[in-house]
């Protein structure tokens, strides 16, 4: 199985509210915001080179700054199938900066 494609890929077009994001903060159900987009990190966390603990730290939060420090734009493109959709109310600057 391809690590860059979850068992049930997301289409990346479903808007996510902050209230919904707040429901996905656990180790077994972890969504993270990067550049105004919400990603379901749940299935990928065990393969993350930095370790699965990242899910505990950033679940339900915006990890844009931290992501940018350690990842290339290529890494962001690899995550496209994990993208749930845009975060409702995310700043246009952050959302527009996405790949």
Regions found by a protein language model. Name each.
Residues 1-99:
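Histidine-anchored, small-residue-rich loop motif
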């Amino acid at each position: 199985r391809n690590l860059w494609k979850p068992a049930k890929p997301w289409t990346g077009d479903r808007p996510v509210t902050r209230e919904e994001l707040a429901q996905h903060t656990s180790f077994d159900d972890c969504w993270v915001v990067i550049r105004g987009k919400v990603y379901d990190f749940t299935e990928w966390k065990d393969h993350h080179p930095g370790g699965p603990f990242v899910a505990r730290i950033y679940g339900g939060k915006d990890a844009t700054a931290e992501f940018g420090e350690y990842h290339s734009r290529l890494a962001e493109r690899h995550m496209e199938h994990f993208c749930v959709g845009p975060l409702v109310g995310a700043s246009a600057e952050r959302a527009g900066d996405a790949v």
